[in-house]
């Protein structure tokens, strides 16, 4: 089974520029242990703050954060954030300021959410986990989304988290899940802090 997920990124750049076989080979050859944040890879077309339409969106991207414990346990999270609000959000071009999506909704904005709000992530750890335990970690890690993104987990979101474990470190699954939650939260913040203006969307 090969798991996969995508986010809507067709509003920035050439919407017909689909990845092809050659790009797959180039990506594999360029693989390294360095995680690139900001407008790289899947983060190139990621945006936030679309509650009032794409014209009010801001730029987002990819983010990474790793937590390492003294005993040797490592839990990292790589996130591509394509949603509504965090440190970035709905940008009012007329008022030249960021507007809170939460406050807009409380003020009576009832616009239907688009299908362009998705956050996907991968939790990577050296813990020894079974497939079932990886699923538990992914579930717990979703709380990291809830702690950093508003709104989140709507019916139009394709939010997903995959967990990979290398099996080198024996520890409790709940410990990994707890650390994964915080790693996800901080990776979302990293995605916003390391982005840049692109395609008419300011950072």
PLM-predicted stretches and their roles:
Residues 1-203:
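A structural signal for small-residue-enriched, beta-sheet-centric alpha/beta enzyme cores
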């Amino acid at each position: 089974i090969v798991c996969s997920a995508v986010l809507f990124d067709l509003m920035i750049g050439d919407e017909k520029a689909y990845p092809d076989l050659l790009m797959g080979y180039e990506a594999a050859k360029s693989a390294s242990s360095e995680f690139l944040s900001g407008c790289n890879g899947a983060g190139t077309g990621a945006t936030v703050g679309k509650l009032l339409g794409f014209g009010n969106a801001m730029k987002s991207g990819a983010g990474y954060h790793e937590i390492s414990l003294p005993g040797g346990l490592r839990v990292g999270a790589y996130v591509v954030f394509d949603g509504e609000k965090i440190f970035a959000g709905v940008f009012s071009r007329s008022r030249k300021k960021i507007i809170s999506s939460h406050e807009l909704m409380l003020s009576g904005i009832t616009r239907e959410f688009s299908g362009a709000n998705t956050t996907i992530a991968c939790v990577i750890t050296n813990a020894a986990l079974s497939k079932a335990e990886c699923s538990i970690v992914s579930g717990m890690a979703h709380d990291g989304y809830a702690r950093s993104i508003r709104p989140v987990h709507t019916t139009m979101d394709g939010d997903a988290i995959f967990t990979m474990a290398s099996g080198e470190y024996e520890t409790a699954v709940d410990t990994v899940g707890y650390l994964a939650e915080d790693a996800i939260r901080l990776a979302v913040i990293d995605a916003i802090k390391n982005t840049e203006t692109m395609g008419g969307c300011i950072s």
